[in-house]
Structures are given as structure tokens and as C-alpha cells.
Amino acid sequence: MGRSRVVIPEVVRVPLSEGDYIDVKRDLNAGEYFDLLTVMAERRKFAKILAYLVGWSFVGQDEHPIPYALDDPEDARRDTIGALDKGTLRELVAAIDKHEAAQDQALAKKKATLPVTDGALVSAAT
């Protein structure tokens, strides 16, 4: 029996500096990944952040939470990200890139531990 080839929707918390965190999708499914590649090819800003980011712990100058929800329109979420300072944007990008690389590495390791078959085709008897 092989591995499951379906992405189970999960959210993981990624720590940032100063006690902050972001919540991101553990992994993108094929449709989400294709959408990400498409918007990245269109050079739309914050494409990868929008694909992964689910929420965060950020507060504004008034110490109130900065709202961010997947239910908000994409343009509103893009504008919210665009209002952050450059250092926070860099930290978001680095954290999501690191998370994505770790997930890719975990998948490669999982694939490497699967039993090797001889490549023979199996057909169902009718």
C-alpha cells in the first residue's frame, strides 16, 4: 500500500520574533499550489503569503489586534499585508519559505521510506 496522496487541511503555528506568531496551512493541495504558481507568474504581490497565511498575533499601534481572516476578500487581505512594516514583511516571507522547505523535506523523507516496487503494472481482474 502506498502513501496517502490527499492533503489533509491542517493549520500550524509558526513562531516569529518578539513573541508573535503566524498560523499557516501545513501544506497546499494541488489546486492551491497551482493557483499559487499562476499568481506568482502574474507577479501579483504577496502571492505566497496569501496562499499560506491563515492568521496572526499582530497588534497595531493602539495595541488592538490587526484583523486578518481568510473570509475577508483577497484584496483586503493584500492591503492589510501591504500596511505592515518592511521588517515584518521580510520576516513573514522568511518564515513561510522556511515552513514550505521543511514540509517539502518531510515529504521527500516520507517518500524515501516507502517500499520500492519493481514497477510492474497491476490490473484488476474483471
Task: Show where each model-derived region lies.
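Extended acidic low-complexity intrinsically disordered regions
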Residues: 1-10
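Short, surface-exposed, charged amphipathic helix/loop patches that serve as local interaction elements
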Residues: 3, 20-126
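Short acidic-hydrophobic surface loop/beta-edge motif
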Residues: 9-19
